[in-house]
Amino acid sequence: MKKILIYLGIFLTLSFIGHSYIIFRFIHDGVLFTGPNDGIEQMIPIQMFLFDKWSVGNLFYATDFGLGGDFFTDLSYYFSTNILFIINVLCIILLKTIIHINTQGLLFWMVNALVISIIKASLAMYCTYLYSKFISRNTWISIIMAFLFVMSPLYYRFTVYWPFFSDVFIWMPLLLFSIERTLQKQKFGLFIVTITLIMINNFYFAYYLCLIGAGYILLRIIFRHSKDIIPRGKALILFAISAILGLGNSLFMFFHGVQSFLNNRRVPFSGTVNTFEKLDINTNIFFDNYLIVLLFLTIQALLCIKLYKHFYYRLFAILTFAFILLSFVPFIDQLFNGFSAPQKRWHFILSFNSAILIGLFLKYFRTLKVKSYLISNIIAEIIIFASAITYHKFVAWLVLVPIVSLIGLLILILKDRRYRINLSYIFGISIILLNLMVSFVFIKNQIYFKDHQERANTFYINSSLYSSDLQRSLVNTMENSKREDERIDWRVNEQDNTPMYQHFKGLSLYSSIFHHNILDYYYDALKINLAEESLSRYQSINGRQNIASLFAVRYMMLKDYQGNLPAYFKKVKTSGQYSIYENTLNLPSVKVTKNVYNSKSLKTSIDREHAMLNGVIMDNAGKSFKQPESNLLSKVDMQQQNIKQIGKNRYKVSGGKGGTIKLHLPKQIRDKYNDFYLTMKIKRGNPDSNYTVAINNYANHRLFNNSTYRTGVDTQLYRTHPDKNGDITITLSPDGEFYVDLQQLNGENYDTLKKAHDNANFDTSYYDIKNGIQVQLSHHESGIASINIPYRKGMRAYVDGQPAKIQKVNYMMTSVPVEKNAKQIVIKYQPPYWNTMIFISLMSMILSAVFVKIINSKKRKMRK
């Protein structure tokens, strides 16, 4: 134990050194080690949200998780099953009992991210050291390998934007170490534990690591080391059994992570992918690019064929060379991303291979002849300096390249053993310094670029662009003036996780995974248009009054320049550039109704809104909706400008100012309705690009067809009203071809909403409890109690203490049947099969212990 602590102390020191530039920039310039996009928009808000819920004992369900939902399952891609984060939360809770910590403050979580990165890097170096020491039998070289891998540019890139990505720097070396230990010592315990932890930690990277582990096992079984003691066939069987046991051990967490993926709605990637990528500054992995930089020594080590006689040197030389070639094949990016859109997230494997290869080169290079060393070194340096000349880019670490090379050469030239040993240590230190300089330059050029410095700093996070004192004060004012079950429609610019870090019940969420019920509701049932198309977000209600009232939105806050205000919101407060509007036709979040409509009878979004206002919508139950709104498209005049029809529903825009399709509405129609819903199918043609659909003063920015983040939903609904001339103007830009199919134009006079508002019972409401809600019912008839929170399988309902049936209504909401005298509804949530998975995991853990004991006893008998 003492030895472990010593090494952890060494690696903690090295980690501080590796983070020294980051710490300096934070203290001196206030620059954060958290990215300006996903970092402060996703990672920090999600961590704050999880801490807020867990610290009060709410583990699974919350109504303020966007529109509400199972945050434990849906955030398993991020942090809800992340072992390091769970330990981090427990430590913070413990510290809060001793000292005052402002966990509501953003800066605390920004600093926490840096502290955790330092600790994580220390653990990662220790795990890499264990593997390196096992295969090299050299402590000094193993420390160098660990530093080269963990303190490489990719670790910083992962950590600054997606901190859970860099967990692989711990798990991959530990996995490979457990495999080697199994093959050479027949000890399966660590392998089973490692598989268990990997599966628990993150289901997405469990897939990566399973591919890596399976590939490594196959390689090591095919190409055996002289110290391997398990026969090939037996090794395959025992590894398979161990992996299954590890999976079983993890099911109490892993199962729910997989459920989040299966419940997600994501369009299959259908874009074109090149067979190969060309070599340029972005793909040259030996020079300063945005993703990964391998030291020039990697090239030199690959060229030293004589050293291939050593088993692990040969293994990692082949792996390094193979993965260098594969880095130019986009299909590999798709393979590691589950055969979806290509994502460059697997390059940590290449970084690891390179680090191990350089370490082994350092161990064996003294057996080279001077000529071999010089030839391989000169070729490596030519590649590096040729890159600098080609890209017209000088980076500071180039100065160290010839110095490192010269030290290595001196070791070969000098005959005195004492000098050679001392120079060998200096050579190792010089490689560490080179790696450090490469990483610092990478951080400066590829992470701390202009946008990062401007948007990821201590000033920005307290400004009006992210979270100012005035914003938080106004949010508190709205919070104190509404009921607990009412919502606030507000977000800072494009910060869709504003509700998470300003602590209110909002309407928006930015996450990679959503339960499909919510997206089905947004995309299909009501066709709520997102101003900025993205598969990873939902936001607001596109100014649609009916939906605002259905979700009990009490207040909306807008900046001076923002518009798209719902029809019956009135201004109640102005402060600086902000205005607060109150919903004058709000509805309670809970209602009891006898009216049930069959979803199959509803054909348009406006009819679905009216059905929800009058009653509830169910699948395969209820009566037909008898009051459909008429399509007004046949009653409008249409004109075009800068746009030419080139086929059925195909148009071409030219002129550089956008093409317009103008719909003129007769006065009698304009006088009859307050708002209009325009439904159209719109898709970009050639040339493919991002494009904008502007409906009068509202701009909808949509993604190019090949975009990874495109929703794949081409039929859009725009709430609008005519200008002073009675026109609804559709403007398409930029120039090029579009597919446009105008499908519906419906008018809305809000008579249905007004009637629902007048008849509403505002004495009925809910308040949040741990993992659920409690509804207090006032006077009502028997019927269905509809509650505007997302339904999830795993909910249990109790009416006045007695179990009751619970089901989905309104495409995503929750309902419970109640009798006339019912007073209270309690809804509790636990992820489906929670107890079952815990039981299976416990049984699997017992079997794992028995399996390891049997294997160990057989091994002892073999020794006798």
Model regions and ranges:
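Membrane-embedded helix bundles of polyisoprenyl
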Residues: 116-134, 140-183, 187-224, 235-258, ...
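Extracytoplasmic/lumenal acceptor-recognition loop(s) of multi-pass membrane glycoenzymes
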Residues: 74-79, 434-458, 479-547, 587, ...
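A cross-kingdom signal targeting lumenal/periplasmic-facing segments of multi-pass membrane
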Residues: 84, 126, 502-610, 614-635, ...
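Start-transfer (signal-anchor) and selected internal transmembrane alpha helices
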Residues: 1-26, 427-428, 846-864
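Contiguous transmembrane helix-bundle modules in multi-pass membrane proteins
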Residues: 205, 318-324, 337-463, 822-823, ...
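Active-site-proximal, structured, solvent-exposed surfaces of multi-pass membrane proteins
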Residues: 47, 634-864
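Membrane-interface coil-to-helix junctions
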Residues: 15-124, 150-159, 163-169, 263-266, ...
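Periplasmic/ER-lumenal interhelical loops and adjacent helix-loop junctions
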Residues: 41, 45-50, 83, 89, ...
